[in-house]
Amino acid sequence: AFTPTPLLNDTLAKEVMEHIIEPTIKGLIADGTPYQGVLYAGLMVTEEGPKLIEYNCRFGDPECQPLMTRLETDALELLLATAEGRLDKVKPKWSKHAALTVVMAAKGYPGSYEKGTEIKGVEEAAAIDGITVFHAGTRRENGKLLAQGGRVLNVTAMAPSVKEAQEKAYVAVSKIDW
């Protein structure tokens, strides 16, 4: 996952809002179930225009990690404004840098995968400037970090461009061993 995407321009954003998001919100209201909260729209951009794949009433994973890395506004402020119905009064501020997340998955994922394998090098990776390591499927046991799930770690890098963020993320990934 990475942000910003070169696909999103004003025309596409308007099309998504007019043909996907707004009809959904209006439909929920018409059904007597107005929604206030996080609404993640999984979209695919095709030659025929944007297509809705899924909605989730939560942040997307791993899509959320690079977005939150670029967000300069306090996320709690945005969530509180959402809950209080005043989100239109808050303008989020974003870093001009790009952010990219590499998902480190257990061998065999999404099928059967090994659990309990030791992970080393996370601290070394996280020490790289512009890197954040998000834990997904990990646990600590007897002072060791162990893989517990299919998607184990999300290594997120921020840099001036997506290409630089990708390079930085993979340098960090190379420090992690399990």
Regions found by a protein language model. Give the residues of each.
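Peripheral (often C-terminal) accessory segments that flank ATP-dependent C-N-forming ligase machineries
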Residues: 81-178
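A sequence-level detector of short, solvent-exposed, charge-rich linear segments
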Residues: 35, 43, 71-74, 94, ...
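Gly/Ser/Thr-rich active-site loops/lids in small-molecule metabolic enzymes
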Residues: 5-18, 61-81, 117-133, 176
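Internal nucleotide-binding/catalytic subdomain
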Residues: 1-64
